[in-house]
Amino acid sequence: GMRKGMIVDLTKTTNAIAKSIEKAQRSSGYEITSALVSIAGSHVSSINSRGAVGITNGVVSQVDINRALEAAQVVAIPHDREVLHVIQRGFTIDGQDGINEPIGMHGYRLEVETHIITASAASVENIRKCVEATGVKVKAFVLNPLASAEVVLTEAERQLGVMVCDIGGGTTDLAVYINNNVWYTTVIPIGGDLITSDIAYGLRLSLPDAEKVKVAYGRAKESDTSAHEIFSIRPFGEEEATEIRY
């Protein structure tokens, strides 16, 4: 029901989500009534923006931070886009940058540097419609590589600098962390399904058979392969198996 992160069949997508929810409920023993939903696709984009405001009463408060974040969002975001995240990357007070926690600090001018992630409003609503058709309430949407990072990254890795690369079926999702902040995100509309398709075309196999070959014999690094490794396949129209050396 989805292709490269975009819904192409509402019914199939809803049914797939329902099966996933049922499986999760069965394995966890809990009823799922609401969820944070990860999102990806070629419709997702991001920009960097800055916002600046005067500091009320000369001491930074949460109100000042909120005002600065709102100012950062005064950018040319089209009406057909929905803001998923406004991620603060650092603050500057009166020209002093590199500040992470400005609350309580004295100054006159507060600036914030942000990373703003948006998605197609129509795509977001289509995903919401499919999820809520299963009886599960969508609490919020989160960009897929950010959700993945919460699971696989340590704080030390985020601090030193790291990139998350999540290769899915239809997309490859990237997020770069520097100094514990998100500095770059992107969604590339190419994933594992394209590799399967190339194998099917090159070896003249069905997609299910090509997927089996990819999983069984695929290697992430060329150094992991052996020049003497051989496997057998039966291409379309062939009665006898063919040996493949790689």
Task: Please give the residue ranges for each predicted region.
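Nucleotide/phosphate-binding catalytic cleft detector across ATP-hydrolyzing
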Residues: 1-164, 181-183, 203-246
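Glycine-rich phosphate-binding loop of actin/hexokinase-like ATP-binding domains
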Residues: 160-202
